Amino acid sequence: MTAHLKKAELHCHIEGATPPELALRQARKYGVDTSAIIRDRAYVWEDFTSFVRCYDAVASLFRTEGDYALLAETYLTELAKAGTIYSEIIVSPDHGVTIGLGADAYIEGLAAGMEAARVKTGIESRMLITGIRHLGPDSVIRTAEYAAMRRHPLVTGFNLAGEERMHSVAEFSRAFDIVRDAGLGLTIHAGELSGAFSVRDALDHVRPARISHGVRAIEDGDLVKRLADEGVVLEVCPGSNVALQVFPDFASHPLRRLYEAGVRVTLNSDDPPFFHTSLAQEYEIAFHAMGFSDSEIDRMTKTAIEAAFVDEPTREKLLAALHV
């Protein structure tokens, strides 16, 4: 059991963290029929394409600053109840623009919820602005420019998410240069739906501190060694990987092999209710299904804090809290 362990997370898409119960309440608020995406209080999808469609439908249920404050506070409060001391949420200002709320109001709403959760529970959290890969390089550059300009104290990083099989990583290098120059931490989705080559391309063209997922690096031994040698941190999401059939089961998941090869790995939930998981469940999976000991899991949590996109005083406070 891992309930007694402190936890930290670097990879969760905030709209993807919406509990079905909250989605249903939002649907009633706006008079939206959710029968195609929620059945028996669970999200319904079959493959990555239908997952994205379901995700977008859920995201459309949040339309005001107050809605987003509620979402962030709800998620982070539940994390804190499970012993989580730190969380990074992946956010998409593009969605705020699409729904007519605006990027600034979207960020401010989330920030209000994050602060409310911190006051209530003590949990620290930060936002990573994400570009959407399948919207193309020009869209991602605009998002990067916004992230570089919008210096909210809780916005500390930049990510690239979306359909990994569309566009080459090199097409997004300018966007990452923009946010790197602005001092934001860099991570990028790679090595999930695409193979080891996508991780290598990310290292070559983006030079991130972290890779979102990255698990298919296991297909290339030289790449695994490179990750270990360069100290690049992988944000690993086992429950998501099995749900999306990146790997058929936890026995075949490479987290243990990556860990033993010296790669810096962390535990994350990705889009937890969509994949019938939670951060607490990911810790349980590591313990029961993958054979990690308490001390090994603690090491992964420490890695997450060491790799977090936070200022050094906050990092020191979190490291001190890890074993309190």
Curated annotation (Swiss-Prot):
Q: Which reaction does it catalyse?
A: adenine + H2O + H(+) = hypoxanthine + NH4(+)
The positions annotated for binding Zn(2+) are: H11, H13, H189, D270
Q: Does the keyword Cell membrane belong to this entry?
A: no
What PANTHER family is this protein classified in? Answer: ADENINE DEAMINASE
Note the HAMAP family from the entry: Adenine_deaminase
- Offer one example of a GO biological process linked to this entry: nucleotide metabolic process
> Which family would the database say this protein is a member of?
Belongs to the metallo-dependent hydrolases superfamily. Adenosine and AMP deaminases family. Adenine deaminase type 2 subfamily.
Q: Which residues are marked as site: Important for catalytic activity?
A: H213
Species source reads Rhizobium meliloti (strain 1021)
Q: Which keywords appear in this protein's UniProt record, sorted alphabetically? A: Hydrolase, Metal-binding, Nucleotide metabolism, Zinc
Alphabetized InterPro entries for the sequence: A_deaminase_dom, ADE, Ado/ade_deaminase, Metal_Hydrolase
GO molecular function, a single term? zinc ion binding
As recorded in UniProt, its EC number(s) are 3.5.4.2
Which residues participate in substrate binding?
A: D271
This protein's source sits in the domain of life called Bacteria
Record note on cofactor: Binds 1 zinc ion per subunit.
Give all cystine bridges in this chain: none
Report the protein's function.
Catalyzes the hydrolytic deamination of adenine to hypoxanthine. Plays an important role in the purine salvage pathway and in nitrogen catabolism.
Which catalytic residues are annotated?
Answer: E192 (proton donor)
> Per the entry, which co-factors are needed?
Zn(2+)
Task: Report the protein name in the record.
Answer: Adenine deaminase
